Amino acid sequence: MSTHFVDRVVVHASGGDGGNGCASVHREKFKPLGGPDGGNGGKGGDVILEVDPQVTTLLDLQRRPHRSAPDGRFGMGSHRNGADGDDLVIGVPDGTIVRSASGELLADLVGPGTRYVAAPGGRGGLGNAALASAKRKAPGFALLGEPGEVLDLHLEVKTLADVALVGFPSAGKSSLVAALSAARPKIADYPFTTLVPNLGVVEAGSTRYTVADVPGLIPGASEGRGLGLDFLRHVERCVALVHVLDGANLETDRDPVSDLEAIEKELAAYRVDDGAVPLQDRPRIIVINKADVPDARDMAEIVRADLEEQGAPVFVVSAVAHTGLRELSFAMAELVSAARAAEPEAVPTRIVLSPRAVDDQGFKVTREEYGDQENRQVRFRVRGEKPRRWVRQTDFTNDEAVGYLADRLARLGVEDELFKAGATPGAEVVIGDDANAVVFDWEPTMHAGAEVLGQRGSDLRLEDHSRPTRDEKRLQERERRAAKVTARDELEAERRAGHWTAADEADEELSQR
């Protein structure tokens, strides 16, 4: 496990796309007007992060960072709705923090079973049966499913422990965790043996708490030297700190007092999240380890008075000989109990059932200028959740669907706001502000029942209805009269040439009357 511990990873999550609605008409013998029967599309699956007690690392997400939920199924005829896509549940360790690509805190997952919907799936499109109304009895179109949300998530694990053991490498922190609990971390006689945080559960009387063995710190850890920045964040959740000092250190330039000052300096330089207690202000205990070595006992007697001046209790212990551990465990239990008692009691959440807002009802129309100084152009941009969602649901290959979109925008008040912003017929209008924005030339909507008179799948408002000018009308009238005179001359020439019969002449006389 020590070589495969991963506590930071970037996940590319993609929610499932919603299924398209179905545009179909009921067909049955002796029922010529069966009506629309297209079903709705299914909802896309969500990508969900869930705390799993059996998961202790983000290794699986590092190996497979791209996670996509299944899409919703398409609607079908006979009022058959498409099936929803299954949710993709990803297990993460307890204490996982979820941030956006910009660094915004999205979720802090603490406690088994805690869930966070990381990438919601798209909603399914409505079938033509759901779109039928008194004016549009048999829609020849259906709405498309919405695409699922796609985003990058930065996951970070911060160890959940009550007490953190900090100190220089080879100070005996792992041995101390193994002696206090049933944990079996890797222990060796060389520095930086511990490369991952090790957790152990300690029982002192009626108090049960967890202890974390943080990898060794060195001067400059808060600036990234050694393994400092990678594992100092695992100390953030601890309510108390235990300084483990090496009493049997053989280096001439180090002693327990200088080691304590160096570690305190690094803890003070480390910046915690907003609202958290700084590391240097948290309760602490000082432990001189390796008391089984004669030189360590002598060193403890020399520096004990200087260490007690720091304002923290000092314990001389031996993780190998198991001496002084009982007193140390009860001292740590007192700090944990005091911290737990100081926490405010959790107020039971009152469950209130109320309608959930679908989305933001508002929108905004802005005037934009673009281009160089010599060729300045103007366009109008419509921003809002509803217009953007409606555009995503529209099948622009179907004229009737485009007309339905125009009606929805007009009822929402978009056209009125475009007029107020100075838009004129033919102006460039953009809906949305992302890569899926739609650009079109705006024409005011006609409400004279065009959606009723048009054929299925068409909209008369999208056809060419340009009115001729006065000169064009005069020219058309002259051409009509000239064509009429030409036709009469041709008929007269045929009659004089003897091509007409008596019956033809009788018909001509009747037409003249």
Curated annotation (Swiss-Prot):
PROSITE patterns: G_OBG (PS51710), GTP1_OBG (PS00905), OBG (PS51883), OCT (PS51881). Signal peptide: none annotated. Residues 504-513 have a biased composition (Acidic residues). PANTHER family: DEVELOPMENTALLY REGULATED GTP-BINDING PROTEIN-RELATED, MITOCHONDRIAL RIBOSOME-ASSOCIATED GTPASE 2. Belongs to the TRAFAC class OBG-HflX-like GTPase superfamily. OBG GTPase family. Monomer. This is GTPase Obg. It comes from Kineococcus radiotolerans (strain ATCC BAA-149 / DSM 14245 / SRS30216).
